[in-house]
Amino acid sequence: MAERDSEPRVNIIRPDDEPEVEEERVPDPDMVIKHPLQNSWAMWFFKNDKSRDWKDNLRVITTFDTVEDFWGLYNHTLPASKLQSGCDYSVFKAGIQPMWEDAQNKKGGRWLINLNKTQRQTHLDDFWLETLLCLIGEGFDEHSEEICGATVNIRNKGDKLGLWTRDAQKTEATKKIGIKLKESLSVPPKIVIGFQAHSDTAGKAGSTVKNRFTV
């Protein structure tokens, strides 16, 4: 019969045998490498207050010019679907205001996607994000220079998403931008989206404005 050990075995580790614990290093924010965008952008917020002038209801939230700053902004702002009725988000190239009267916009127009109330919960946020990614990623290829910005309008009667372009007279470029937008958002082929020139829209109710182009 084997003789049992009279004392329990102890695993002795000398101090110099202890495993090293690597401290987690927090990167210096100034040393983080950011990925620049081709253009600088500004995000705007509009809240309809009828007691104030329209322009006074529009303000810049912030500007950004890197991929990381865009995601930091997007992840810390309220989703479009959660905005109150009468509110807008706009993202435009730096130096361009989200209004028809701006010199960069007045000759242009917008591709317009209308969404009903049920689509606010199912499609609006995805459509808005995909539009922004096309915007800041220069996703319209050689026609990206024609892009001014994008807006999302939250309304009781139905929401609107608009992609604003610089020159409504550039028919070929405008149509290709619309086709690319529709593809990027995976809009079903049977659903038609239209382009309206700002000169046709100014001073008219939305339902009376005719589309210049459709895709």
UniProtKB/Swiss-Prot annotation:
Region named Disordered: 1-27
GO biological process: regulation of translation
Gene Ontology molecular function terms on file: RNA 7-methylguanosine cap binding; translation initiation factor activity
Coiled coil: none
Keywords in alphabetical order: Initiation factor, Phosphoprotein, Protein biosynthesis, RNA-binding, Translation regulation
Known partners and oligomeric status: eIF4F is a multi-subunit complex, the composition of which varies with external and internal environmental conditions. It is composed of at least eIF4A, eIF4E and eIF4G. eIF4E is also known to interact with other partners.
Protein family per UniProt: Belongs to the eukaryotic initiation factor 4E family.
PTM (free text): Phosphorylation increases the ability of the protein to bind to mRNA caps and to form the eIF4F complex.
Record-given protein name: Eukaryotic translation initiation factor 4E
Alphabetical list of Pfam families matching this protein: IF4E
Cellular component, GO annotation: eukaryotic translation initiation factor 4F complex
Function comment: Recognizes and binds the 7-methylguanosine-containing mRNA cap during an early step in the initiation of protein synthesis and facilitates ribosome binding by inducing the unwinding of the mRNAs secondary structures.
Residues carrying Phosphoserine: 207
